[in-house]
Amino acid sequence: MSLLHQARFFITVNHLRDLPATAVPEVAFAGRSNAGKSTAINILCNQKRLAFSSRTPGRTQHINYFSVAPVKAPDPLAFLVDLPGYGYAEVSGSAKYHWQGLLSDYVQTRQQLSGLILMMDARRPFTDLDCQMVEWFLPTGRPIHVLLTKADKLTNSDNAKALRETRKMLQGYAEQMETPVPMTAQLFSSLKRRGIEEAQGVIAGWLNLPEAQKAEARSAAEKSEPPAADPAE
């Protein structure tokens, strides 16, 4: 079982000064207000009501922290960080200004941040605001993994096209950097439970969770095994 299944609500933050003063790694989740971010977090953590989605898109304007640790552990091993959904027009100007500042400052300056999970609707990837998020985070040199959500809404051929075009866009961004930045993408569907294990593996690796260490050890052991002898020899 993934340790992500043990995630628990930790704190809600409305100002950078209130961020947890911890040194453990964090993975942030970002995306448009209607990209299915809260639903995806709940699915990845195998919980129904860990991350709440507002009935009115764009109303969740805080940063929510979820701790990841075994049930009886005294301290978190890591944090999942649910960032405010962006891009919804009904938010007032002053709230939007504060919200955008909170988002940009967090992703650009948070030293504990190990990587960004960027959620995009597979039908409408790379909106202007999605591109803005990539451009804010890219200079940090940390990895970005795109979840193309709501893949169940598309045909197989349209999904393949969306994934191909997304990877091409990410490659274009990566080529702008002097030092290579890991940028990957996958298809994801909360409804069809598609892509869950792949996404969990990425997150566990970034957070250096025990399950990722075990998977790495198994992979190393398999690579070190001598090839099977040819029966003909």
From Swiss-Prot:
Biased composition (Basic and acidic residues): 214-225
Residues that, per the record, bind Mg(2+): S38, T60
Region described as Disordered: spans on this chain: 214-233
UniProt-listed GO biological process terms: division septum assembly
Domain of life the protein comes from: Bacteria
Domain EngB-type G: 23-209
Key words, A-Z: Cell cycle, Cell division, GTP-binding, Magnesium, Metal-binding, Nucleotide-binding, Septation
Function text: Necessary for normal cell division and for the maintenance of normal septation.
PANTHER family registered for this protein in UniProt: ENGB-TYPE G DOMAIN-CONTAINING PROTEIN, MSS1/TRME-RELATED GTP-BINDING PROTEIN
NCBIfam families: GTPase_YsxC
Alphabetical list of HAMAP family matching this protein: GTPase_EngB
Name of this protein: Probable GTP-binding protein EngB
Lineage of the species this protein comes from: Bacteria, Pseudomonadati, Pseudomonadota, Betaproteobacteria, Burkholderiales
Gene: engB
